[in-house]
């Protein structure tokens, strides 16, 4: 069982997007594609926290993920009546013919996958001529509690907090061959965050659970102590702004 299978049941509870945000992202994605009824593949679809909006609207959408548990969670969602088209496969070896899709969507996949060049090569291969490759991510307030605790956790683990270095490299790689690129912010929202909530999310996070169990326990205990000293209580709540960014790359050739 992969770490993503292990956390599939709780993934949406900790990382769901607001309904309005998912709907706004869908509108932005469809608005960026020239085809009237575009065929879209969502690579790293996970539990469908974004894909449900496409499925509910009856779009020509395919969700792909390596984790069987995540796809089962997607299929079991209560906010979709239609059966989603889901495929379990490695993103670096997509089971689709060349030029199969008008749009390819990649949302926060680089942190959980080695070999991003192979991923992008496959994404380009299945993209039709004139198609659009899209990179999406949720961005937290850099001064908010989540960002502060993430930086502290990185320091406790002896890491340099550069969470987007693979994504940045991927963006530069795509920009070098794309005929055009642009960035959109289709959704902004406010969310309540607490130190305790951050600890709960990270205790069940797929990336964090790849670390040795003893190291995870030690890091969370130290982070908990730091948070109490920094914020007074683990249940103190803060309101912060979040946004969804979408970077679009258009390719004259597939």
Where on the chain are the PLM-derived regions?
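A short SAM/SAH-binding and catalytic strip from SAM-dependent methyltransferases
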Residues: 103-115
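A short glycine-rich, Lys/Arg-flanked "PGG" loop and its adjoining helix->strand segment in the class I
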Residues: 117-129
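Class I SAM-dependent methyltransferase SAM/SAH-binding core
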Residues: 39-93
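A short acidic, Gly/Pro-enriched loop at the edge of an enzyme's catalytic core
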Residues: 92-103
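Short alpha-helix
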Residues: 162-177
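Conserved Class I S-adenosyl-L-methionine
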Residues: 47-49, 176-254
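Conserved class I S-adenosyl-L-methionine
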Residues: 1-35, 49, 53, 70-73, 132-163, ...
């Amino acid at each position: 069982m992969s770490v993503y299978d292990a956390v599939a049941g709780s993934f949406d509870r900790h990382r769901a997007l607001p309904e309005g945000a998912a709907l706004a992202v869908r509108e932005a994605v469809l608005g960026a594609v020239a085809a009237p009824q575009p065929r879209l593949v969502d690579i790293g679809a996970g539990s469908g926290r974004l894909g449900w909006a496409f499925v509910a609207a009856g779009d020509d959408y395919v969700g792909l993920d390596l984790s069987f548990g995540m796809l089962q969670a997607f299929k079991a969602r209560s906010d979709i009546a239609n059966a989603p088209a889901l495929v379990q496969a490695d993103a670096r070896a997509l089971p689709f013919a060349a030029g199969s899709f008008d749009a390819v969507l990649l949302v926060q996949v680089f942190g959980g996958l080695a070999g991003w060049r192979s991923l992008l090569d496959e994404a380009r291969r299945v993209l039709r001529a004139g198609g659009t490759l899209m990179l999406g991510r949720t961005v937290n307030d850099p001064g908010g509690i989540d960002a502060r605790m993430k930086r502290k956790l990185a320091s406790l683990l002896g890491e340099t907090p550069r969470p987007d270095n693979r994504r940045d490299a991927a963006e530069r790689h795509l920009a070098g061959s794309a005929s055009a690129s642009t960035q959109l912010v289709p959704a902004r929202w406010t969310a309540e965050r607490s130190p305790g909530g951050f600890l709960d999310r990270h205790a069940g996070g797929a990336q964090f659970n790849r670390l040795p169990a003893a190291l995870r326990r030690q890091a969370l205990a130290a982070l908990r102590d730091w948070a109490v000293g920094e914020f007074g209580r683990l249940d103190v709540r803060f309101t912060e702004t979040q946004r969804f960014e979408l970077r679009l790359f258009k390719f004259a050739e597939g």
